[in-house]
């Protein structure tokens, strides 16, 4: 449609001729209430209104537009009133568990109940075409998981009890939940869309969108992108005729928007160079033909850019920059009611000064008559002054001021427009609330800057000389002025408060009735034909070249008016264009008709035009072969390398990819590449001493210099976006971590610096912590506390009901260096603080646990643990726990609701070993998992969990501990666990029998080198995306040999069977989720690599250089999804980085076909991992049969974006001995049975009764493995009988009857857990490690060894300082200094795979796990 300004119909001012007044003033009726009022609402097109008292919860109803009010006494303790927006007779009143619904505008109500309270975040979802179909959402559980709740549904308006729709939902809504979405279509009447928890995960990165047509008896996950489903769903909303779903990438705040018009076909919305981020976009009140989105263009000031989509919601173009927003995401954007295309916005005129210097915003108002494509100034009639208005709905009246910018609200006056915003005039001095009635023939306003006793009204369109006043007889502070939503009534309601006699204030509702002012009702003849009806009529005009077209996607406007051009910015080729040698293609002219525009004929500006192929943003040409690029650098060592992996790659757009790596050499030069090492450039000109990638967001990276200057980027260094800020003080000199990051607020930083440290050995020098909420910019640093060892943000995505501002610090008491540490906490940047613990040894903050170790008066250590950061519980250990002194620890893993620690038993150099212990689910009880596990001097432990598959782990043990204690060299063997060992083949890769074959597993097993002996400690056996695949370097025999004797082995079945793939020691990496595996000789000069495309069946050679170079490492992106790799090494005196690109191979030109409905139809098989010691049902692993997607070996295609490899839990298995482990205080015997540790007494089984249990079981030596989901069968944890707790005998008898079968009650551990720390009994893996063997089964270790007599103690993440000469050892996240030439300790979140950002080490570990450190692994500059 083409809008002609002078002929626009006004939204509300129908401009009917004023009727002759029969009375001098409207009638007034006042009703007084004791409490403040909320939820004042009219039923549409009626005179019935509802209102609620805030204090009492009472609901009142008025049938006569507010003249008289009556309490609805049956509606008790209502929490809120929610009207059905699609039916003016229906409303809900929600209570705690009892609720009420009306279908006759509140005259009668029917009650119903739900189990829990309604959600505070949109508790009701209405069906737009059936008023009986309603969804009720219960309050979400946000403590231990991201906020997930339960939803009920009704199809009969709650005549019957509501039924459970789905549990574990983020949100749900009807497909027909918007008036225009699926309008007029008969299908999908019962369709519901829900964002649910992941298949087998509660993490927000795994949230899925599910669609059901039968109330979730069955459900499907829609295909969103490139024929694949998409995880990480964050939100969805209906916008006119569109449904928009937002997807959040892991380790990033970046979002992708997917749009559909039918719930069946989804498209990835494209914003050109724009980027959508979490909490940084607002979907605005859009038109019928397009979606309008305001996107924050600055992270730390509320300024945005307005984008408008094309008609299918796919392509968005920027219309205006510097729109004004507030911190809550509300945008100064208003549409003139009932008229498509007229938009008013406020822009920030001095945006650059606001962003750079924090200047005060200068706001200006602009209006558009073409749906936001072009904007112009607001003009006052008879004046050349600009008008600026405060944002307000309806906007044919507004409070504002003339001049250069928008002033304060209280300095504004009331203006009115009678031509839909084209021109404006002053109505009343001072700011007023206002409302329209009788289609605009009556305008009412009330003073809004304080108390007033007058109400103003105009019957002549609000012109300044037409206003009259109504004397109320008392002063009122106006809160709200309203009428019917369509402004057709002559009755208004004014709500406010007035002073009471005797003090205080009372609340009043005043009805203003203008009906008696008219002698007669206006008839048709009284209306000017031009303004006869507020219903718009349309007349198509001839298309105008300048007014009816806008720039198409990929083009940006240049010039204005007739000189306006649309210049190519990013041209995307149409499908199949520019192939087969074509030099041109038919593409966009650069123009498109404005969405919804109904012009005809005239200009044909949007017709396709011929364009040259080389104008398009083409992906690099495919070479049909592997390519390599060698880059040389000055220096002797690479100090640091980090991948900044983008998690929102769009597989549909081959140009929308970057693989960014940052690297630091020992020349103190930082380099950056965006194409995985094909082209490098200097990141910054200054010398850099450390690189800090953001712990939680891969888009952020920081380059620290030797001064206070810090360079940083918020988008992976793209588009020359590296800026700088000044830190408050120099970095600390105490080897402490310098930067700490917030998991949610990406711009919140804690800087650990050194104060008064300019002079060497200054006595005044001490550490000081500072915080910035603006990423260090704009002099935003505020001091926290001084004399601190560590400060960290406490908030996490789930499990901690704390403020985002909460910070824990370890501070020296009385601010004295060397004084004992105390743990202090604050929610307001330490304006107030709380001392949590004194005499602190160490604190560890992880994703799930917070562990604090303190020293007692007798020099023993006490351990306290918390899940919620509020309540701590003490951990108790068996008798004689501290008899064996601990000297060091290494944190191995805490990714499965328990902490794995290695406790050093022998700390002597080159003779280190210790025990692995495992905590229960709340971190308060530790039990033995494996003895005599090997460790090296740097603190690394030979222990690694397999990635992508739970429960499989490999460790190396020292088998001659007695000799080692006497000074002998360590002899090591490898153990693997799938729960209780694994089977091995007896043939080598060449088909020959091993020399040791037939000698039994003691003499003939496979042993592999772990962390402690790897040349590059950043390598891993497995990949998070190549399920079931592992590579290792080792040998077959009686014990682990040297690296020089080692060969390279591979397994494709999670360690059940292994085969030798190459003689000698190789480094490896996985690409495209296992589609390609590349290996290279480690630490030797070489000119080639080997690669396999069929999971190791065939190995091919690729020569990447004409001369040999020494390769020290091979890397790829942390997710192992790329087809690019980097080799790192040296060529003579130069450093070299070699890019290997496999994407050109013909085998990867097609994207793999994955259909979840028929998973084996396309390019994938379903793989089921097996248990090596389950003769009856080998497919049962942890009590269930799990199915995983694995690409077929002969499939010639690429996986692309990360796949959710877990397809399904096919079934649960019956319980067997393999589903149980030894209970607390029990140890495994050589025959496999569990026996009470000598000297300990049985626990009192009745102890659970004092904690609220109604029954208890006899003590069992066994407990179920936490990962097991087995059902029935041999339940070893219920070997005894169940008994009633005192006082529950009768209930027990009724429940159990003759069957004697009862609810399982876990035997809790012998310590008192405080509130908030539940009894999730997570179990010990004692004795579950079996040799990687070729022969028969045997005991895993000697239980008579003195190292098994008592579970060895360790403090999670804490240094056990009880030895005479304590040895401080960092956790796994410490990078081995010197291995890669570094001169600095490791970062708290950096692993041996530190430059592979986000990658796990000993297991798939949350970034938080890096918090667990000893003193010597901290930072130094």
UniProtKB/Swiss-Prot annotation:
This is Vacuolar protein sorting/targeting protein 10. Functions as a sorting receptor in the Golgi compartment required for the intracellular sorting and delivery of soluble vacuolar proteins, like carboxypeptidase Y (CPY) and proteinase A. Executes multiple rounds of sorting by cycling between the late Golgi and a prevacuolar endosome-like compartment. Residues 1-21 form the signal peptide. SMART domains: VPS10 (SM00602). Coiled coil: none annotated. The keyword Membrane applies. It is found in: Golgi apparatus, trans-Golgi network membrane; Prevacuolar compartment membrane. Glycans are attached at residues 288, 922, 1212. Keywords: Glycoprotein, Golgi apparatus, Membrane, Protein transport, Receptor, Repeat, Signal, Transmembrane, Transmembrane helix, Transport. Belongs to the VPS10-related sortilin family. One of its GO terms (biological process) is protein targeting to vacuole. Residues 596-625 are annotated as: Disordered. Residues 22-1296, 1371-1421 are lumenal. The gene is VPS10. The chain crosses the membrane at residues 1297-1317, 1350-1370. GO terms for cellular component: cytosol; Golgi apparatus; membrane. Residues 1318-1349 are cytoplasmic. Gene3D superfamilies: 2.10.70.80, 3.30.60.270, YVTN repeat-like/Quinoprotein amine dehydrogenase. The keyword Cytoplasm does not apply. It is a multi-pass membrane protein. It comes from Phaeosphaeria nodorum (strain SN15 / ATCC MYA-4574 / FGSC 10173) (Glume blotch fungus). It holds the Pfam family Sortilin_C. Residues 603-615 have a biased composition (Basic and acidic residues). BNR repeats lie at residues 100-110, 367-376, 415-425, 671-682, 1049-1059.
